Amino acid sequence: MGLRENDDGWDFKVLILDDEWVLRIPRNEPAAAKLATEAGLLPALAPALPVEIPRFEHASREPPFVVYRLIRGEPLRHDDPDGVRAFLAALHAFDASGIDLPRPDWLEAWRENAARFRDVVLPLLEPGERSRGEALLQEVETLVGFEPRLTHCDLEACHLLVRDGRLAGVIDWAGARIGDPALDYGWLLNDPFPDWDVDDELRRRASLYYRFGPWFAVEYGLRTNQPEWVRSGLENLRSRL
């Protein structure tokens, strides 16, 4: 019996058994609540998507954990742009009205993010960087005017799995909520697929979300006393200011 551990996740500890089964264990109560949300969403969502997503074979409430078959694949680089767009279209067209999901007041939630960043991240920047950081924080006021849709909220390379050159699976749905679909384009438009033809306003908001990504990493590093997260987060933050 082989056992591999992935301890990198913010919310979950992951164990892989015999290269076949994934055991996902929340680190705290908020993560356990996210896991319960996933358990309610994924069975309804799976038939609507052109890719694999986790299908929980076992879900325990106490202690909280889930088990599902490993979805095989390598992290997305520049593969299968048409397949990725087909996945996004299906995801954002999904009617989640009957599913218990977070439905935050989007602007207010981002105002709260900005307030935290202003308190704990902005002071870590050099004086010459702070004005640009403050200008970015003020741009959260422009995150309006979109039709809220189901969003994954954490689409990056390690959550988009490719087999034989095609997008085959999407994992880690803990952040799924009703929100701005531009958030799901943030990394995609600013790394693997910058030439995609998309609406200018969607691209603008996606760029904002991408620029804010490292602020969350710095905050996480400070909160969990992990200096490496702070260091790498600040490096990425500066590159996106």
Which positions does each model-derived feature cover?
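An alpha-helical support segment within catalytic cores of ATP-dependent transferases
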Residues: 1, 72, 80, 93-153, ...
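FAD-dependent flavoprotein oxygenase/oxidase catalytic domain
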Residues: 10, 48-53, 72, 95, ...
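Hydrophobic packing residues in well-ordered alpha-helices of helical domains and bundles
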Residues: 35, 81-84, 133, 211, ...
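ATP/Mg2+ or Mg2+-diphosphate-binding catalytic cores
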Residues: 32, 119-124, 128, 200, ...
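Active-site Asp-x-Gly
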Residues: 30-32, 146-151, 156-208, 212
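A cross-family signal for key residues in well-ordered alpha-helices
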Residues: 43, 189, 219
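ATP-binding pocket architecture of kinase catalytic cores
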Residues: 2-106, 122, 145
